[in-house]
């Protein structure tokens, strides 16, 4: 947020949407693409015997920095979804269902963001003002992977956008105005180190769903019944490969998404 770097938004989004334990009670110190094992002895960067478990999901490691900070992840993410610029500029930097409130020249402004992003590329911003129209530079971050998108105000003529940058609509916004950003999220394959290929859909990184053996550990150092560690090994074939330029087909199951509230006993 200090740098205002457009590229950092893509990195931040990818990290936030990566693999985490849903109750935040276990984490990896190190993670790597195509990791075959996640056990107490699987780390390839051991840092001595105590560091061998750093690629496993555990509540704690030989150092405390990650365990003490992992719970900050989504509060930090949410606090940076909306940012401010100069001259009353409002910036939608990271997308997700949310609401932003401010006051400009005595007029209270509320912007409601409706979206299923990152599972849908349709993002709708609804403006509610309790007074006269006010001039607002309204800026949206357009991810670098975007090839096609449509940006409109009140369903009128599409506006220009800048992929991999920031697009600003500056106008006198009034109560009831609607800004829509519709991103065409296509699957794409990106080459990685050592002839690897990553498959993405928008900001989401896909992985093959393989069967797994899970050993729950409750009696080791820094583990308990409430905060166990896990040894995870594959229980089905994992050694799949992709051609250099794969053809990818998307199948929409029609499943509707809903917010999931973590119950009080397991809330981190």
Could you tell me what each predicted segment is?
Residues 1-12, 260-268:
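Single conserved hydrophobic/aromatic residue that forms the stacking wall/gate
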Residues 136-139, 169-184, 188-190:
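C-terminal beta-strand-rich structural cap/linker in extracellular carbohydrate-active enzymes
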Residues 65, 74, 247-259, 263, ...:
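Accessory carbohydrate-recognition regions in carbohydrate-active enzymes
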